[in-house]
Amino acid sequence: MPKFVFVTGGVVSSIGKGIVAASLGRLLKSRGYNVSILKLDPYLNVDPGTMSPFQHGEVFVTEDGAETDLDLGHYERFTDTALSRLNSVTTGSIYQSVINKERRGDYDGGTVQVIPHITQEIRERIHRVGANSNADVVITEIGGTVGDIESLPFLEAIREFKGDVGKKDIAYIHVTLLPFIGTSGELKTKPTQHSVKELRSIGIQPDLLICRSDRPINDNLKNKISGFCGVNNEAVIPALDADSIYSVPLALKAEGLCKEVLEFLDLTDHECNLEKWQELVHKLRNPGPSVKVAVVGKYVQLNDAYLSVVEALRHACIENDASLDLHWICAEKIEEEGSNDLLTGMDAIVVPGGFGSRGVDGKIAAIQWAREQRVPFLGLCLGMQCAVIEWARNLAGLKEATSFELDQSTPHPVIHLLPEQQDVVDLGGTMRLGVYPCRLQAETMGQKLYGEQVVYERHRHRYEFNNAYRNLFIESGYTISGTSPDGRLVELIELKGHPFFTACQYHPEFLSRPGKPHPLFKGLIAAAQSRLPRSPQEALKQTQINSPNQSKNNP
């Protein structure tokens, strides 16, 4: 049976529980332990698939097609472990399962209640991860903040969980905040004390405290927290604000987090191997020349909507010894002001995924600009569909061409609905989701970047390239460099004669890892680097042509 670690959070939301869980996973894996991490989300949605990116941020897609919280992306990237739909649990999915069981008569006419039925379902979900993941340690992050009404069933479930396993098979970690009060010139422990008191009132005594702070925590404060909160002094772990999320595992290792957890779980503290991770952080802190990358999107007001895209760009920059100079460009602003003013000076352009018509014309204009100005371009999902529409309108003479999603009366639906989607009514969980194979055409840029003939990529879409336009597309100078194995679905396209112009129907950002960047992102950054000035004179010239009004954030 695996060991179980539960991570809760107090005082404020967005305190970093996900990064703590992912970092602990990385530290345990560096000692030879298999780890699986799951997230318990307290919202009533069955999954985040139908939620607005402005409310929830990115929807991360697992190999088996689950639409999950963005924290699962952190878990996968830090542990380099593929997770499944078992690793994402919401209040909505719990209630849905319990109600379905009640309708089937599984409860033999009993009164169905939060306790024991809801909490039992939650516990079963956690045990299921342990039984199906081959993990030595299962880490569970509980979403929300201690004290929230929504989180109470989950907290009660993990309290009950202690009765399911042995005393040495479970550990509770509480992430809290030590705010600095400028007028008094000191860090305050009272919010942490009250948060732990709230957790204790539920019946959970934390074994370790991760104390977030923007400045060092001295021994006197640690002793005070230890005394008031009932934890060992060594179990009060400072977690100072970090320059990068990838430096957090190293910082927590230095503070003894993994050693304390292993001691609580009665596991051997094997030799830790973090050499590659340390090299990664060193390269991140000591980058080469910067590359300006514009992300042209429709949800740029909330950067978390494109979290995996940003991390994939960062991984590629680390690998290529480059510094990422990221510019958020609102697609609708391009519609108002034009591409030239907003994109001049960019070394690469990424057009990520999305849904609906808002901002699409701005994305298409950005793609046209990248094509004509020979600026490296990478399109993802909707970004590929926009690249096809741009081709049809500007190179094939099909002025009214668009996607069937955007205009069902268009005479030229160069992007149309997948056949299997024709009769789909529900929105949630019904797209083409999860991993599918892609066969690459030999001697194409895509095949050279991957170095493989067949690759497996994660998808999330309802619409596809319309094969009625395939021959015209190829005759116009484009190459279809990747398709489904049967050749029916267009997965990857590229433009001949362009330094780097490629787009894919899938989401390569979900497979990028620190130290193992995705080939398409790595290729994009390499192409961007080829544009960098090679001499002081060229650098001056590049500075002069950059727009003086260029902003890093154009919401």
Swiss-Prot record:
In this chain, CTP is annotated as bound at: 13, 148-150, 188-193, 224
Biased region (Polar residues) positions are 540-555
What's the protein here called? CTP synthase
PROSITE patterns linked to this entry: GATASE_TYPE_1
**Where does the Glutamine amidotransferase type-1 domain start and stop, copy by copy?**
292-534
- Keyword flag Nucleotide-binding: yes
* List of residues binding L-glutamine: 354, 382-385, 405, 462
What's its EC?
6.3.4.2
Q: What else is known?
A: CTPSs have evolved a hybrid strategy for distinguishing between UTP and CTP. The overlapping regions of the product feedback inhibitory and substrate sites recognize a common feature in both compounds, the triphosphate moiety. To differentiate isosteric substrate and product pyrimidine rings, an additional pocket far from the expected kinase/ligase catalytic site, specifically recognizes the cytosine and ribose portions of the product inhibitor.
**Segments passing through the bilayer:** none
Q: Which residues bind ATP?
A: 14-19, 71
MF terms (GO), sorted A to Z: ATP binding; CTP synthase activity; glutaminase activity; identical protein binding; metal ion binding
Q: Where is the active site?
A: 381 (nucleophile), 507, 509
